[in-house]
């Protein structure tokens, strides 16, 4: 009986040791926090108000920073990366404010999506890519 318990404990220990490098690699992510250019649709202290604004603009997200909720319609490392999204918002008569803000984001995905956004002129593709950028790239999104 003691021999079986010892074998089981050894197997668990070996498994744990072998799993540590894999776990530490998965914990490393490509998140960065730095100044980004954003198209802000509103800033709210109340989540319900921010949710209402988000619902009025397809593809927008709510970004929480401490106790403040930002409704964002676009994000890019470069100001020129927002040009196509700005055109769409203007065409739809949606008010926005362009500014810089510090955002926690997934650096790997942001580069990929910004390149795709720059290469397309199709409005539906631009809206879809922008929505993916906001949802997959921006951390702290609600």
Where would I find each of the regions flagged by the language model?
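Acidic/polar low-complexity segments and flexible, solvent-exposed patches
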Residues: 1-142
């Amino acid at each position: 009986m003691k021999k079986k318990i010892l074998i089981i404990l050894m197997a668990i220990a070996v498994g744990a040791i072998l799993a540590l490098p894999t776990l530490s690699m998965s914990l490393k992510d490509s998140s960065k926090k730095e100044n980004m250019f954003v198209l802000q649709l509103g800033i709210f202290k109340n989540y319900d108000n921010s949710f209402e604004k988000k619902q009025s603009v397809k593809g927008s997200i709510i970004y929480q920073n401490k106790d403040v909720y930002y409704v964002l319609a676009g994000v890019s490392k470069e100001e020129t990366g927002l040009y196509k999204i700005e055109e769409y918002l203007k065409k739809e008569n949606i008010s926005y404010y362009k500014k810089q803000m510090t955002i926690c984001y997934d650096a790997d995905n942001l580069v990929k999506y910004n390149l795709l956004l720059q290469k397309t002129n199709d409005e539906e593709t631009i809206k879809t890519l922008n929505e993916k950028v906001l949802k997959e790239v921006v951390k702290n999104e609600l």
